[in-house]
């Protein structure tokens, strides 16, 4: 789970400008430009970000979160449990899950380099939703990982709802994990666990 999460979270950086990418579906230069901008921000603030998870979270909030439909993704993860959950529990899960991901894996942002991702030509129908943006992420050891961004939208509004690394879906992976946990302990306990995990990471930490 940890290795998958690391690949997926690094992959989210390729979607820092998905709305522009989604409209053209051939905007390699847009992704490259955005990646370079992000890389510059990290380079100029590296010391600050390295010691302050809250600053990392704010950077993620600004550059990445707006490009993802966390609510729709959370609904897909909870599946049938979303339908039976109260509105309050739905909201709590969306928030807790996002904060858990940032708290647990947010410091991977520090290792992002623009030359580690390559966006492939779009081979689908831009008029149909969902659409897939195919990319290749190069890991530190040189391994190339095929990563697809599954996007839903239309017109000028496209947002990421799932990421698949080598065919392994972020949504399906967490759905399988949480489905077992919910069956044993209930949704409320899962939400509390996510909240506790997110809160257990200090706002200022080097990991």
Residue ranges and their predicted role:
Residues 25, 40, 44-47, 51-55, ...:
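Surface-exposed, polar/charged faces of alpha-helical domains
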Residues 24-105:
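Early exported N-terminus immediately downstream of N-terminal targeting peptides
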Residues 11-14:
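Short, linear, compositionally biased motifs with a strong N-terminal bias
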Residues 162-207:
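Low-complexity, intrinsically disordered terminal/linker segments enriched in charged
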Residues 144-172:
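Short beta-strand edge/turn micro-motifs at domain boundaries
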Residues 1-8:
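Bacterial N-terminal signal peptides that target proteins for export
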Residues 103-145, 197-207:
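Surface-exposed, charged secondary-structure patches
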């Amino acid at each position: 789970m940890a290795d998958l999460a690391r690949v997926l979270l690094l992959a989210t950086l390729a979607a820092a400008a998905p709305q522009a990418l989604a409209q053209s579906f051939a905007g390699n230069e847009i992704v490259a430009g955005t990646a370079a901008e992000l890389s510059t921000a990290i380079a100029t603030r590296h010391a600050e970000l390295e010691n302050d998870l809250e600053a990392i979270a704010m950077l993620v909030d600004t550059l990445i979160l707006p490009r993802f439909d966390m609510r729709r993704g959370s609904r897909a993860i909870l599946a049938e449990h979303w339908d039976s959950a109260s509105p309050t529990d739905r909201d709590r899960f969306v928030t807790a899950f996002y904060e858990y991901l940032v708290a647990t894996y947010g410091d991977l942002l520090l290792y992002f380099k623009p030359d580690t991702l390559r966006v492939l030509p779009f081979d689908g129908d831009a008029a149909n939703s969902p659409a897939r943006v195919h990319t290749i992420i190069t890991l530190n050891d040189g391994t190339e990982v095929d990563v697809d961004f599954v996007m839903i939208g239309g017109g000028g509004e496209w947002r990421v709802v799932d990421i698949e690394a080598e065919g392994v879906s972020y949504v399906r992976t967490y759905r399988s994990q949480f489905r077992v946990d919910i069956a044993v302990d209930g949704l409320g306990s899962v939400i509390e666990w996510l909240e506790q995990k997110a809160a257990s990471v200090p706002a200022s930490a080097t990991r």
